[in-house]
Structure formats: structure tokens, C-alpha cells
Amino acid sequence: MKENNTTDETALSLDGPVAAPQHHTVLFENDRIRVVDFRVGPGDTVPLHTHRWATVNYVITLSDFLSRDSDGNLKHDSRDGDSPQREGAVFCMPAFPPLHSVENIGCGEIRGITVELKD
């Protein structure tokens, strides 16, 4: 998989585990993959960040959430029911370069394991 134009220092600083280390824990990394444990507690907001590579995501727990772009515009409300995200779901996503934030507006933790495909 190709990396999404994140070769300069500014772009690298917006990578999820760098921009929001309290929400992204790297469990394993080599030259081909990176495995990340993603957690967002109730009421927490993950600051603006990007996803450098295509991913395979496993949802462990889910709560209602909002996703916003870099201007604060609402891009996704999980309560709309149009998302593949549900507990136990596995889904793929392309690299996601636009800056976005995630706000947990529910009562439970959002937690998932992400396998990022570097090549």
C-alpha cells in the first residue's frame, strides 16, 4: 500500500500515534505493518490526525461518536446508522489523509485494533 503524502515533518506529526498518543498505542511495528490499539473514553476527543496507510480494523467496543474535519465541520455521526462500525466488526479502510478528529459522545469506551498495511 502506498503511503499518503506524509513525508514531511508536519504530516508525520499528524500521524495518529504521534498526534494522539493517549489514544493510539503501537503494539507492533516493522517495515510492512503497524498494529495499533485505539481507545477513546467517554467524553474524550481524539485531536486532529490522519491515517498514513490502508488499514484492517477490528472493533472491540463501540460507543456513539462524532467525526469532524479540520474546520470543525461534522463529517460523521455514528447515530445515523450508516457505518460499518459495530462491536465485533472487521472492515478495511483506505489511507485517510484528511485531518479529522473523533469525539466519543457515548457512555462506553471506543476500542479497536488496527493493522496498518505499509506496502
Give the residues covered by each predicted segment.
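A short glycine-rich, His/Asp/Glu-containing loop-to-beta-strand
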Residues: 20-47, 52-57, 112-115
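C-terminal partner/receptor-binding element of secreted or periplasmic proteins
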Residues: 107-119
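N-terminal low-complexity, Pro/Thr/Ser-rich intrinsically disordered segments
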Residues: 3-20
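Residue-level recognition of short, solvent-exposed, well-ordered loop/turn junctions
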Residues: 41, 60, 84-86
